Each structure stands twice: as C-alpha cells, then as structure tokens.
Design a protein with these regions (language model features):
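Polytopic transmembrane helical bundles with strong interfacial aromatic enrichment
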Residues: 1-434
C-alpha cells in the first residue's frame, strides 16, 4: 500500500495543498473582516479591530501565496519526471489555456496583495517616506504579469496565422514559454516581498547600531545565513553557483553587522534577480529536460532572499524607535474590496487547478498503468469545466456569506442583550439623604 501511495506526486501534492489551504484560509478570514469593517461605524473601535483582523488574514494569505509557486514547480517537475507526455499534456496540450487563466488569477492575487499593502501605508505614520517606490513596484509587477499571461500560441484565423508566419507570434511567442514565465513569477515574488518589507518598516525610526543589539541576535543571524548556504547545496545548485551566492550572503551578513543592513538586503535582491534573469534567458538555449531544472535554481535563490532578508530586517529594526502608532481603522474602504477579490480568486483558482490535476489522467485511473474503460472516461472541455467550477465557487461564497450573516446576527443580539442588562441593573449604594 505504501509503495502505491508514495509515488512521484504524493509529497508535492501534499505540500502544495497544505500551503494553498493556509493562503485560502487567510483570505477567507480577511474577507470576513472586510465585511465587518464595512458594516461598522466610522472611527469606531469595532472598525479598528476588523481592520487589524483583515491585515492579519491578508498577511497569512500572502505568507501562503509567496511559497505556493515553489511547491507548484516541484509538483510540475515530478509530473514531468514520472511521464514527460503527462507534463506536455499539462503545459502544452488541452490544459495549456487553463494555465493562462491561472496566470490571470495569480497575477490578480499578487497585484491585489501589493495594492492592499500600499493602501495600508496610509494608516502608518512615517510610511510616506516609502510611497515614492510604489510606481516602480507597480511597473515591475505589471510587466511581469503581462509576460506571465502571454500564451505561447494564439487562437487565430488562417489569414492571421499566415501574417504571423505560423501559430506563434514572432515577438509575443518568446514570452509564452516557461523560461519567461518562471522568471516573471519569481520577480513578482521578490517585488511582493520588497513591498512587505517597506510596509513593515513604515513607522520605524532610526536604526539601532549593531553594537547595541544582543549577541544572541547576531549569532542567530549568522546561523540563518549558514543554513541558507546549506539549503542551496541541498536543493542541487551547481558548486559554482553555491560559491557565488554564499559569497554574496556572507557579504550581506558583514554589511548588516557593520550597520549597513539595508545595503545588505539590496545586495541580496540584486543577486537573486540576477540569478533569476540569467537562468530565464539561458533556458532558451538548452533542452526542455535541462530547462525544467533551472526553475529549482531560480526558486532556491529567491527562497534564500526571503529567509535571510527577513532575518536581517528583524535584527536591524529590533528596538528601533517608532515614528507613531498604527492608526487601525484609517485604511481606505476600497482596500476591503481587495480582500473580497483575494478570497474569490483563491477559491476559483483552487477549483480550476483541481480540475487540471484530475483531468490530466484523461482516460486512465493511474496514468499508463490502469486504464479507465467506463463510459465516463473522458475529460470535460475547458469551457464546461470552468462553468461548473464557477457555479461551485458561487455556491461556496453564498454559503460563507450566510455564515457571516448568522455570526453577525449572533453578535448583534448578544450586544443588545448586554445593553438591556446594563439598563435594568439596580443601582446599589446609599441615597443622598443618607
């Protein structure tokens, strides 16, 4: 039994579902908080509470969203490893346009998550220092989003295909392959991480010198850097790349210890972006089986920046004076609709990808092992499956909205009961005459 369960996709699917459920759960909590935020009175304590709750829910969702493509890369690599035809069916066959829909939804998730962080800076005193970076971050995200959703082949008439010289556009076709798409999504992850770092340090003042930081913090930072180098080795990076990235990590650590932590973080971002872009371009000149392995090199570089960059940020801003307290409840109301968008996109995306995972088997119970001879052994068309998934998503959201409404009624009834008890409570103590 264990030999049958422990197959190529067992662990990748488990990890992918685990991370996706974290992101999905966080987005639903954030959507509930958004509903309560909009239903509360302005400048009320309740609105401040649900603003905080929405931020926490969105934070959990983003923490799941950022590593989710990494788990997807692993799952895709194992699918190709099990059977290359299965991978071709997934990315270049009948399901290829489904991944264009996936790109649109995930792009909306990244853009929405970043937009929410940028709007959240309006409630943070001192965050106006970093708002000048927002147009550049938005530009990077938009370009990467456009690259990611560009299809490799276009639906075109015979006349249009003749004008293009084939089914592939001479320019846009270059951006339709996985080398470009892997590069784009990794740059989007780095950009989202940078937005979060700017948000996190929004109300932080001057940095505390490293000489005043605890020895334990410095040792922990050094250990995390060393573990990052080990991670690069474990993930199968070639020795020359491990050596280069290890040197950059050590230099970033030295800069952090020399009170230049932000420079060290910038160096890490530059290193990771260079690795991602280099292997994205190099992927055009190698075979597909080699190109698939490049995604791991790109992912490991980004993952190292996420881990070490976060550690440096925590240490260098530890104990820093605050410019002011966060004004919970002062975020613009349009930010709450972003939280609704995130919850809807996550739900729809999970349904569509479930169709892709199940439909990949086509007319097999186990691909190329046990054939399905039943009358229902067919794969629904993308349009039919998308319609069914959309109806299911709508029903799910209506059920969740009904639960939200019931919870709101219960809370409201409890509050009214408490108010009546306060009014009816007898006044104790002596009178003025006494």
């Amino acid at each position: 039994m264990w030999e049958a369960m422990n197959n190529f996709t067992w662990n990748p699917v488990n990890l992918h579902r685990f991370i996706a459920n974290i992101a999905f759960g966080g987005s639903v909590v954030a959507a509930y908080a958004a509903f309560r935020f909009l239903a509360s009175a302005p400048d009320s304590e309740e609105r401040a509470h649900y603003d905080w709750m929405g931020y926490i829910g969105n934070f959990i969702a983003v923490c799941g969203l950022i590593p989710l493509p990494f788990a997807g890369y692993w799952l895709g690599r194992e699918i190709y490893g099990y059977d290359q035809q299965l991978g071709i069916t997934m990315m270049g066959g009948i399901f290829s346009w489904l991944f264009i829909i996936q790109a649109v939804l995930i792009g909306a998730l990244f853009l929405g998550a970043n937009y929410y962080l940028w709007l959240g800076m309006e409630r943070i005193p001192g965050a106006e220092r970093y708002r000048r970076f927002t147009p550049y971050l938005l530009g990077i995200l938009t370009v990467c989003f456009l690259v990611w959703l560009t299809p490799h082949s276009l639906v075109a008439s015979l006349e249009e295909a003749r004008k293009m010289g084939g089914a592939h556009h001479p320019l846009l076709g270059v951006f339709g392959v996985m080398s470009a798409k892997n590069t784009a999504v990794n740059i989007m992850i780095l950009t989202t991480f940078l937005s979060f770092l700017l948000y996190r340090r929004g109300n932080k003042g001057a940095l505390i010198p490293m000489a005043q930081q605890s020895t334990a913090s410095k040792v922990a930072l050094a250990l995390i850097t060393a573990l990052a180098v080990v991670l690069l080795t474990v993930l199968g990076n070639p020795p020359f790349l491990v050596l280069i990235e290890a040197a950059v990590l050590v230099l970033a650590l030295a800069l952090a210890l020399a009170n230049r932590g932000t420079w060290g973080q910038g160096l890490l971002f530059l290193m990771s972006a260079s690795v991602v872009i280099f292997y994205g371009v190099y992927g055009y000149f190698v075979e597909a089986i080699v190109r698939i392995g490049f995604s791991i090199l790109q992912v490991s570089s980004v993952l190292v920046v996420l881990v070490v960059g976060t550690a440096i940020d925590i240490v260098i801003f530890r104990g820093a004076p605050l410019v002011g307290d966060i004004r919970w409840g002062k975020i613009p109301e349009r930010a709450q609709y972003i939280l609704f968008l995130l919850a809807t996109s996550f739900t729809w995306l999970m349904g569509l990808m479930g169709y892709a995972r199940s439909g990949l088997r086509t007319h097999w119970h186990i691909f190329n092992v046990v054939r399905d001879y039943s009358s229902d052994a067919f794969t629904p068309r993308l349009g039919d499956a998308s319609l069914v998934v959309s109806i299911i998503v709508l029903v799910f959201l209506l059920l969740v909205s009904f639960i939200f409404w019931l919870a709101h009624l219960g809370t409201q009834a409890h509050a009214e009961e408490g108010a009546l008890l306060e009014v009816a409570a007898p006044v104790t103590g002596g009178s003025d005459a006494d």
